[in-house]
From Swiss-Prot:
The lineage of its organism: Eukaryota, Metazoa, Ecdysozoa, Nematoda, Chromadorea. Keywords: DNA-binding, Nucleus, Transcription, Transcription regulation. Belongs to the bZIP family. This is Transcription factor zip-11. Its main location: nucleus. The gene is zip-11.
């Protein structure tokens, strides 16, 4: 029974013998289009042994030769196609609709940040003097990612509308907090500037008084020298 005696592209296994192969034996079986002794096309399913890592797909690699497929080196390049695999880890799962919508919205926000944030009024901070400054890209990305993290921590909900509404509200709150933080920072800089200007004015007045005293002392000294 094992190994199969495959000569001239013919397999000595019957249909039932093929069906009785376990997943590990499937892997070692000569997986190559050939005819069985019953003249039935043999496309034996490759299966992923549990002791092998999932690295590449069988159909994503160059089709191996008959001799290559007959080797028993457990080469990871010979993987089963996803449609044939019996292991859950190789199967594809459809992303839930609500998660897909959130991903789509976040993708649009990221695209907006990268391409249009500099010209968007909503993405700029307006200071007390009326000047506008674009929010740095890193800060905008942090706002979006923080919102995603908050959603993950709160857990998923079955109500798509509620999830999207919560996400939008959290984005608004995060953006408002950032604007308040930037305004406070800008106001602090204005206060520091005003304090420095007051200090500069006081120093100028003090320097003027000192220069006046020096001039008066010079005149008094010269007057004493003249009397002598």
């Amino acid at each position: 029974m094992w190994p199969p005696n495959a000569e001239n592209n013919h397999c000595n296994y019957s249909y039932h013998e093929h069906a009785e192969l376990n997943p590990h034996d499937h892997y070692h079986h000569h997986h190559y289009p050939h005819s069985s002794v019953h003249h039935t096309e043999c496309y034996q399913t490759l299966s992923c042994p549990s002791d092998l890592p999932v690295e590449t797909s069988y159909y994503n690699s160059v089709p191996p030769s008959y001799q290559d497929l007959g080797q028993t080196d457990l080469s990871p390049q010979f993987w089963c196609a996803e449609v044939d695999c019996v292991h859950e880890r190789c199967s594809t799962k459809e992303i839930p609709h609500e998660q897909s919508k959130i991903f789509e919205e976040i993708s649009k926000e990221c695209d907006h940040i990268m391409n249009s944030a500099g010209d968007c009024e909503k993405c700029q901070v307006e200071h007390e003097n009326g000047a506008q400054e674009a929010i740095p890209i890193n800060d905008l990305v942090d706002i979006v990612m923080q919102t995603v993290d908050n959603l993950k921590k709160e857990g998923s909900s079955n109500d798509e509308t509620k999830l999207l509404s919560r996400k939008r509200q959290q984005n608004k709150v995060a953006a408002a907090r950032y604007r308040d933080k930037q305004k406070a920072k800008w106001q602090d800089l204005l206060d520091q500037l005003e304090a420095e200007e007051d200090r500069n004015q006081r120093l100028k007045l003090q320097a003027g008084h000192l220069e006046k005293e020096v001039a008066e002392m010079r005149q008094a000294f010269l007057a004493k020298l003249a009397k002598k």
